[in-house]
Amino acid sequence: MLFELNRASRAEILAEARQIAGLALPMMVAQIAQVATSFVDTVMAGRVGTDDLAAVSLGASVFITVYVTLMGVVAALNPILSHHLGSRDRRAFSRDAAQGLWFGLMLGALGAGLMLLLEAPLRHWLHLPPDVTDKVMLFITGAAIGMPAAMAHRALHAYASSLGHPKAIMVVSLLALALNIPLNYILIHGLFGMPRMGGAGCGWATGIVFWFNCLALLTYVSWHRHFRDSRILAGLAAPDWRRFLAFLKLGVPIGLSFFVEVSLFSFIALLIAELGTVVVATHQSVLNFSSLIYMLPQSVATALSVRVGHHAGAGDYRAARFISGVGMLMGLAMAGGAMALVLLLREPIMWMYSADPRVIAMGTTLLLFAAVYQLTDAAQTIASGALRGYKLTAVPMLIHITSFWVAGLGLGMLLGLTDWIVPRMGIYGFWTALVISLTVAGLLLTYYLARASRKRLHRDQGILL
C-alpha cells in the first residue's frame, strides 16, 4: 500500500490525523481570513465605482504575484526550523528563526522595490484612462509599503508553526481582517483628515494591515508562555549572509513553483480577455470558488512540511513517510467531499457570484471541470508540502514548470485559441488543459514523494536500492 499505511493500525492513523489537523485547522482559518480581506477589498471598491474596482483588480494582480512568489521563498524556513527542532539543535533553531526575520524584512524590501519599479512600465502597457491608471499606481504604492512586513510576518509564521503553536497566527489574522474593514472605509472616503483615495485606499489599507500583522505576531510570540523557551528576539544578531544563501538555496525553487502556479491563472485571465466579459467574469467566479476550496489541502500541506520536517530532522524516516501518507489520505478525503459539494451545488454556487443567466450557465459547466481536478490538485499540493519537509524542492519546481506552463498554459492556448488539435474550444479548452496539468502534477509529485521517502527510509536502514 502507498506509504506502507497498511502496516499501521487504525488508531495510529487517527492519532496522526489529529496531530496534522491540530496544526492545519488554525492555519486554514488564518488563510481564509486573508482571502476574506481580498474579498472585502473587492466588494468595498466595487461600491465606489467600476473604475475603482478595475484599479483594485489590476493593482492586486501585481501585488499578489510578487507576494505569493516571495512567500514561497520564505516558506523554506518551515522545513529548516522543523529540522533543527527534530535534531534537538535549539541553538541552530534560535539562530535561524532570528535570521529568518531579517531575511523576510530584506526580501520584502526587494519585493517592494520591484513593485515600485514596475509602475513606470505598467503606465505604458495599460491602455486605460489616466485617472484609472493613477489609482492602479496608488494601490501598488500602498501595498508595496507593507511588503517588508508581509515577508517578516511569513518568517514569524514559520517560527510559530514549527513550534506547533499556529493559533497565534490565526488570532492575529482574524484581528487583521477586523482592522482592514474600517481602514478601507476611512481611506476610500477620506475620513478623519485622510486623503480621499477611492479604491486605491484598499492598497494602503493592505500595507498598514501587514505592518499590524507583523508587529502583533512579533509581540505575541515574544511574550506568550508557549514561546518562553525559544524567544525569537533572544537570538537576534546582525544579518548573516551565509544563512541567507542557505535559505535562498532551498527557498528559490519553492518561490518559483508558487510563481509558476499563480502566473498560470494570471496569464489565462489575460488570454481569455478577447473572448468577452461574460467569459472573463465566469472564469474569475469559478476560479475564486476553487481558490476557497484550495485552502483545505494547502493548510494540510503546510502542516505536513512541519510534521515531516520534525521527523526527518530527527532521522526518523519511517515516521516521516507515515505522516506523508496520512496527510495524503486526509487531503484526498477532503477533496472527495469538495468534489461532491461542487457537483451537487453548482447552480447555487454560481448564483452567489452573478444573477446573469449566461454567467450561471457557463459557470455550472466550468464547475464540472473544477470538480474533476479536486483530487489531483489536492495530491499535488500535499505532496509538495511533504517534499518541502524533506527539503526536496528542485524536482517539484521542474514538475510544476512542466505541468503548469507546458501542459497547462501551452496546451490551453492550443485548445482554447487555435484549431490545430481540435476545433477552437474557447474557455473550455483552457479548463481542459487545467485538468490535464493538475493531473500530471498530482501523479508525478505523488510518485516522487513515494520514491524519495522510500529511498530515505531504506538508506536509513542500510538497504541498498
Curated annotation (Swiss-Prot):
Cellular component annotations (GO), alphabetically ordered: plasma membrane
Parts forming coiled coils: none
Keywords: Antiport, Cell inner membrane, Cell membrane, Ion transport, Membrane, Transmembrane, Transmembrane helix, Transport
Similarity field: Belongs to the multi antimicrobial extrusion (MATE) (TC 2.A.66.1) family.
Name the record gives this protein: Probable multidrug resistance protein NorM
Keyword Cell membrane assigned: yes
Keyword Isomerase in annotation: no
Topology term for the membrane: Multi-pass membrane protein
Transmembrane segments: 21-43, 58-80, 100-122, 137-156, 169-191, 201-223, 250-272, 287-309, 322-344, 359-376, 395-417, 427-449
GO BP terms in the entry: monoatomic ion transport
InterPro entries in the cross-refs: MATE_fam, MATE_MdtK, MdtK-like
Family matches, as PANTHER family: FMN_FAD EXPORTER YEEO-RELATED, MULTIDRUG RESISTANCE PROTEIN NORM-RELATED
NCBIfam families registered for this protein in UniProt: matE (TIGR00797)
Compartments it resides in: Cell inner membrane
Sample GO molecular function, one term: antiporter activity
Superkingdom field: Bacteria
Main location: membrane
Provenance organism: Chromobacterium violaceum (strain ATCC 12472 / DSM 30191 / JCM 1249 / CCUG 213 / NBRC 12614 / NCIMB 9131 / NCTC 9757 / MK)
Physiological role: Multidrug efflux pump.
